Amino acid sequence: LLWVCSFCKMKLQTGKKTGGRMMQNLEQFLRLLTGHFDNREQFNQMQKAEKVYPLAEHVNTVCNDKIRDLPADFRGKFLVEESYYETNGKKHASAHLFLFTEEQDGVLLTSYEIPEGEDKNSFTYASMKPVDYGDLKKSEKFTPALYREKDGVWEGGSTSQFTPVMKFRLWERFSEACLEVSESIEVNGRRTFGYDDPIRYKRV
């Protein structure tokens, strides 16, 4: 019995250490991802090369403080991603709500619908109203993306089948240097949105 108790205690301590390491991974990942970023340096290079490319801006903010009744043992982090693009003088904004959770082999991104009652066209962290955790809905179209870390660099992505003929591809790499984001949409196998080079966001 003494041996069993000692073994259980050892397993419990090991579990705590593993959980701690996992949370450290999530914190490291979010430290790279959260903040205010733009690709102005890359945009200027593309302008000099006379290539059509967007001037893009990302504002990423953890928003657990705006979500009520999170489970007591909840360890994930919800994040509002605000994106702003300008191409040939035309401006476009979009926003997403993501949940990041620590998994055994990396960090998982799960997309959620913008909360009911919010304006999808102007949704931001600042405008987000408090919402109950139970009212949040996962996106049925988006395939969760898994990110793995190697030498301080996180890389991952996913492919989502939005409709029988429309496919969305996401690939991202996050490091201290920049956030690299590649998004494309294919319809019937033909790319209708996206660029050859990933957008390189640097912290503002």
Language-model segments: residues:
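Soluble ligand-binding/transfer domains with enclosed cavities or grooves
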Residues: D38-V204
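Short, Lys/Arg-enriched N-terminal segments with co-localized hydrophobic residues
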Residues: L1-M22
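N-terminal helix-cap/turn-to-beta initiation motif at the start of protein domains
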Residues: M23-H36
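Alpha-helical structural elements
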Residues: L2-W3, L32, E149, M166
